[in-house]
Amino acid sequence: MKIGVPKEYFIEGIEKGVQKEIDGAIAKLRELGAEIKEVSLPHTEYGLAVYYIIMPAEVSTNLARYDGIRFGHTHGGGADIAMSRSEGFGKESQRRIMLGSFVLSSGFYDAYYRRASLVRELIKDDFKKAFSEVDIIVTPTAPSVAWRIGEKVDDPLKMYLSDVFTVNASLAGLPGLSLPVGYSLPEDGGTTELPVGLQILGSELGEEKVFEVAHVLEQAMKEYVNSKKPSTF
């Protein structure tokens, strides 16, 4: 089994505790007999921008039907469609609908959505090339452990940045999962260690290998992970 580790995913900004647990999980895979190989996904840096253009566009078209007439919440017996949509969607949904409508609007489609779609193909090609060399790719799931409930609700940019390691797999249409491989203290001064996830990615329709690697690693690390689990979990 050849397992790829993309160099672009191990960047400045990963919390030290997260890096330590991820390194430990990769070392365990090597110990279990896997061949660990560095791979390159050169268009990784564009993934977040591309995702947050394409995803809201899909959201806005998908949710357009929820006008309170045939689908969704209805305000005042259907007298006010605008109020039906305002009341029926939360702030984040509204934000994504508005952003998606903007990037699909006349004059901006080519500048944003079309260009993002072209870069998406480059990201797909990066993964295809990498999977011609390895069977599985592993990365951190996120650069940090989870933040406190409600902490970044009013800062969507920071919320979106936490997706930096997972969006490219979605853009490329790849199967993946996040496996807890340890615990780490938040670097913002938290006092409770929180789970660290290892993202395990397979090639297109390669779910079986993803589950296989995840199961073997989970069994091998169960004692270690359980020994670090805080009493509050």
Q: Where do the protein language model's features map onto the residues?
A:
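Structural helix-boundary/capping segments
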Residues: 1-12, 23-32, 65, 95-125, ...
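Serine-dependent amide/ester hydrolase catalytic core
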Residues: 9, 44, 67-171
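Short glycine-/acidic-enriched loop or helix-start segments at secondary-structure transitions
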Residues: 14-15, 48, 109, 147-150, ...
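Short secondary-structure junctions
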Residues: 35-39, 73, 227
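Short beta-strand segments at enzyme active-site cores
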Residues: 37-41, 139-140, 176-180
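Short low-complexity, flexible loop/linker segments enriched in glycine and/or proline
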Residues: 50-56, 153-155, 186-187, 193, ...
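Active-site phosphate/pyrophosphate- and oxyanion-stabilizing loops and adjacent acidic/basic residues
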Residues: 61, 166, 215
